[in-house]
């Protein structure tokens, strides 16, 4: 089962993610991108009730392909597009607002937090090659926001040169364009491991006490 459909305090992780977007009042419409085998299940869950989810579509082989599918599903008169990992349910309204504001001004904005751990470069045999200077290093999160036309240009260039980035910010960098950073949060957890669910329940109790 995809991680975003795993239960957190009895509800899918995605429930809390969408709840924050819905209640923020900042999003006009949302395109949900899911694995093909989860398409009908997701449509039944999220399109039967009035929400900002307007379409549920299938993803691609890689993250970049999935985001591109979502991009194509949006109307051409879209101003700002926001990309978010469904398994980050603890984003805040302030993060959404700030990424939108910065993207509107500069074209591209990503949420991130400074690296505070020691970072080692390690070879394929597990041998440490060197210790990296963490000054100026940030751990990137989502949401990430972009002007619609700029992200489209970035996708076209990436496809032309078979470039794959690990996030959409990398596609903008590949254009030679500026990407601005918005403060993220340690609470903006990406739930990918069983132990993340335990931590997520603790965060959930603080952010969604009614859950």
Stretch-by-stretch model annotation:
Residues 121-146:
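Short, flexible, basic/aromatic active-site loop/helix in glycosyltransferases
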Residues 138-211:
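Conserved alpha/beta core of the MobA/IspD/sugar-nucleotide pyrophosphorylase nucleotidyltransferase superfamily
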Residues 7, 90, 131, 145, ...:
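Short aromatic/basic micro-patch
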